[in-house]
Amino acid sequence: MDKFNVKTYNSISHLGLEKIKHVGLSIDSDKNANAILLRSHKLSIDEIKESVHGIFRAGAGTNNIPIDYCTSKGIAVFNTPGANANAVKELVILSILISSRNIFRAKNSLLKIGDLPTDQFKVEVENLKKEFVGTEIKGRTIGIIGLGKIGSLVAESCISLGMNVIGYDPVISVESAWKLPSAIVRASSPEQLVELSDFISLHLPLNSSTKNIFNANLFSKINKDAVLLNFARQEIVDEKVLDTYLKSKKLKYYVTDFPSPEFLSLDNVISFPHLGASTSSAEENCAIMSGEQIIKFLLDGEIFNSVNFPDTTLKRESSYRLTVVNKNTPNMVGQITSVLAKYGINIHNMINKSKGDLAYNILDLDSSINDQVLNSLININGITKVRYIPNE
């Protein structure tokens, strides 16, 4: 009999699914799910049943998942940062090249003269050659806003291509900053970065502080010959202001992976249909990483790369493992251990980690526990979820 069940939405690479099945987990959309695995599916609250312990996004963005609701129910939400970073980076580099050489404008102009007589066609080709003179990217400056997995890879590639790189990331960790190439020049503000850049590439997550972050203020600093690249999230750019700058030719190109119908006819917009992570390698990497997360979480309660829970690992030293999700308030651990002591349950080892208002505990016990113990724990004010994960 299968121990846990995983429900999938979207097409998930078989490499990730096989990893899940290999350890005895089932993948059945008709059964109650203990874990949900998805890509771009917009998950509704109604689809999250009481049996769900974790939701796993095979990709980086999690704005298609109701995270606040999940947190309130003690449900961990995971993503796979970095698994598709190389795929997105390659499309960004391609976009820098095609925009600097006017590739699409030149191609579209060729289509218009295809029916001309041969001699006239050759003349027009030479005229187009003069019309679409491009620029080389060597020696040009790219400003990168957001220096996470993707932004740092873009920076490395641009440096290797001879570009000057300016970076800005107000929330970068010390550890991540140490990993950045030393050639990156740090901007003191996004305004300074925009003013100095020939290309501006956005690599930020979407949240309340980044929505419309590229606003009228930043657009007012942009060079009319600059190229703005958005491979992060559509809502990061204020499209009302963008529309004005595009139609008044105050921006050379806007290149994006998030097409808008109103911009498709503009010759200074290059749109792709969400191709950033759409490579077989990226999809496989995301599925494999998600599979590994599901296995560790369902079988051992361990967490890595969660957006709402702290990374928490504890080497299993007992067949009787308990996990507890609670509000991050004083004396919660004391109340948990008091209940276990009341029932004569000894703690072999444990770890307690917190993230914001939430705390997560893994406890290895010296003996098994019954429903009476679990009910006593879940009835503690401030505890949102309790799981008993025996390994017998």
Predicted regions and their residues:
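An N-terminal-biased, well-structured beta-alpha scaffold segment characteristic
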Residues: 1-81, 195, 215, 238-240, ...
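Hydrophobic Val/Ile/Leu positions in short beta-strands of Rossmann-like dinucleotide-binding domains
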Residues: 6-8, 144, 324
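Rossmann-like adenosine-cofactor binding region
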Residues: 44-46, 170-263, 278
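Phosphate-binding beta-alpha-beta segment of Rossmann-like dinucleotide-binding domains, i.e.
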Residues: 81-141, 305-307
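Oxidoreductase and adenylate-handling cofactor-binding alpha/beta cores
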Residues: 89-108, 158-163, 289-302, 337-341, ...
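Hydrophobic/small residue at the entry helix of a nucleotide-binding pocket
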Residues: 150
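Rossmann-like dinucleotide-binding domain for NAD(H)/NADP(H)
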Residues: 220, 224-316, 327, 360, ...
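A conserved regulatory-domain signal marking ACT and ACT-like small-molecule sensing domains
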Residues: 304, 308-392
